[in-house]
Structures are given as C-alpha cells and as structure tokens.
From Swiss-Prot:
Summary of the function given for this chain in its UniProt record: The GINS complex plays an essential role in the initiation of DNA replication.
Main subcellular location: nucleus
Lineage summary: Eukaryota, Fungi, Fungi incertae sedis, Microsporidia, Unikaryonidae
Subunit architecture: Component of the GINS complex which is a heterotetramer of SLD5, PSF1, PSF2 and PSF3.
Keywords, ordered alphabetically: DNA replication, Nucleus
Pfam families per record: PSF2_N, Sld5
Entry keyword S-adenosyl-L-methionine: no
Entry GO terms, CC: GINS complex
PANTHER family, alphabetized: DNA REPLICATION COMPLEX GINS PROTEIN PSF2 (PTHR12772:SF0)
GO biological process: DNA replication; double-strand break repair via break-induced replication
Protein name: Probable DNA replication complex GINS protein PSF2
Taxonomic source organism: Encephalitozoon cuniculi (strain GB-M1) (Microsporidian parasite)
Subcellular location: Nucleus
Family note: Belongs to the GINS2/PSF2 family.
Length: 175
C-alpha cells in the first residue's frame, strides 16, 4: 500500500520544533506524551502541529530549525552542486516542512531568499533523479539519502521505467 503526500505531511507535522512561550502555557496532553506547563523564556520542544496551534493563538514563537538557517541552506545547496552524482544528506522532512517553517518562525533571516534556495535544492535533486532514471537498466537504482517525500513524488516514474526495462529484458531472453 502506497503512502500519500498528505500522510507524509501528517507524519512530518509530528516533528519536534523549539518554541518560546510568550505567556504561561498549561500542561499539554497530546497523544504521544504530556508536556509540562511552560512559562515565558522557557524553551521547549513540541510537535510542529501543536506549535502552529499555539502560535496561531499568540501563545508562543517558533524557532527556525538549524537546517533551515540561511547559511545552512546555502551550504546544503553547495554540497548538492558539488556532489553531482549523489544526493547529500538532508533532514528527512526538509521539503514538506520548509515553507511552513520559513513562514511561521520568527528568526528567519530572509524568507524569500531561503524559499528560493529550498526550491533550487529541490530542482538539483530532481535533476539527479532524472539523470539516474535515464541510466536505469531495470535491475537497480541506487538512491541513498533520498527523502520519503522525494521518493513519493517520483516513484511512479521509477517503477514505470523499471517495469519497461524488465519487459525489454524478458523479450530479449525469449528470442
């Protein structure tokens, strides 16, 4: 059974993020665990979905994760460019969460520049995938460090290419 993009997003929203309470927050009883009461100036790690609800209620500010800091994004893009034939290691929910976090965290240096770099990283990684699919021989495709989100986007293309390769191989054997 395949996992849908919506299911990936729901899983990604379970990711823990740091928040800074702006007011006293009572104990949070969530499905996975209970978080103790929080006071202003505390820093806590809670699931993104809860952080977004608290932010919407003006109860906290969400801190930008280090992997989305502008310098980190630039370094990730440089590594992707340098490693032309392999994927660099990025956060597993980098793509589904990047825009949401960039738009909701208070300590973003440059939202537009950061979004542009995230999009560029996505394009570079997609180009690597398409290059790999062109070389697909029907047996294997090595895709180390690809995220679940990326795989879900291109799986039909990969599976279709692999199936065509297998059929051609079977036809060649029959003759």
């Amino acid at each position: 059974m395949a996992i849908s993009p919506e299911e990936i997003l729901h899983i990604a929203y379970e990711e823990l993020v740091e928040i800074e309470p702006m007011t006293s927050i009572p104990e949070l009883r969530l499905l996975e665990r209970t978080y103790p009461p929080l006071m202003p100036l505390d820093i806590a790690r809670i699931p993104l979905y809860a952080a977004l609800l608290l932010k919407k209620s003006n109860m906290c500010k969400i801190r930008l994760p280090s992997y989305l800091q502008l310098e980190s994004l630039k370094m990730s893009m440089d590594v992707e460019i340098e490693k032309a034939d392999e994927y660099s290691c990025i956060h597993p929910y980098f793509f589904p969460l990047a825009t949401e976090l960039l738009e909701n965290c208070y300590n973003v240096e440059s939202i537009e520049e950061s979004k542009m770099i995230v999009e560029k990283i996505k394009e570079i990684r997609l180009a690597k995938t398409l290059k790999g699919i062109k070389c697909l021989d029907g047996k294997a495709l090595n895709m180390n460090n690809i995220t679940l989100f990326e795989f879900n986007e291109i799986k039909e293309l990969i599976l279709g290419s692999a199936e065509v390769g297998r059929r051609i191989e079977d036809l060649a054997k029959d003759q």
